[in-house]
Amino acid sequence: ELGIQNPYALDQKQLDAAIALLKQQNTIIGEYWSDAVAQITSFAGGNTVVGTSWEILRKFAAKPNLKTTLPIEGSTGWYDSWLVSSKTKNVNCAYAWMDYTSTASVNGAIAMNFGMAPANTAFCASSAMAQAHCDEFAAEDEEFWKKVAPWTTPIETCVDGRKDVKCTSFQEWTNAWATVKG
């Protein structure tokens, strides 16, 4: 009803509505966590039964009953990537490293180590273990990924394409979040 197309492109009305909902939900929220150890402890101890998380935490949880679900509304996510500084002294070496880490075997090993979907899905067909990992993290499920909005820093230029309104900035989000947590 608010016309939100991208959760990282909220105008003031949309941000205000989101903050109002979060404040309303404070009565049913057990805790907000900001670090992985606190989150794993909360799930493992039974204090938390549902929440947003990083996929890697499932790998380290003592109880293997942590599962991932994708809400019908979609979810947020992020992509890890290598970046090359404009001031790097060894550009060719940097690009060679990026080429190497993008190969199916290396990218897949990184994905398995960190508990995430590989970017190079050629990895999935390399072994039964690789395919099981790709299945667990929906690596080849295009419909799944269409519902995941990649993380981006909120800025005033709306990244969802709207031109008739100013979106809210990261600082505005930070200030609003402080009112939720108290």
Residues covered by each model-derived region:
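Conserved C-terminal helix/tail region of periplasmic/extracytoplasmic solute-binding proteins
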Residues: 146-182
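Mature extracytoplasmic/periplasmic domains
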Residues: 76, 85-151
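Non-transmembrane alpha-helical segments in soluble domains
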Residues: 19-23, 40, 44, 52, ...
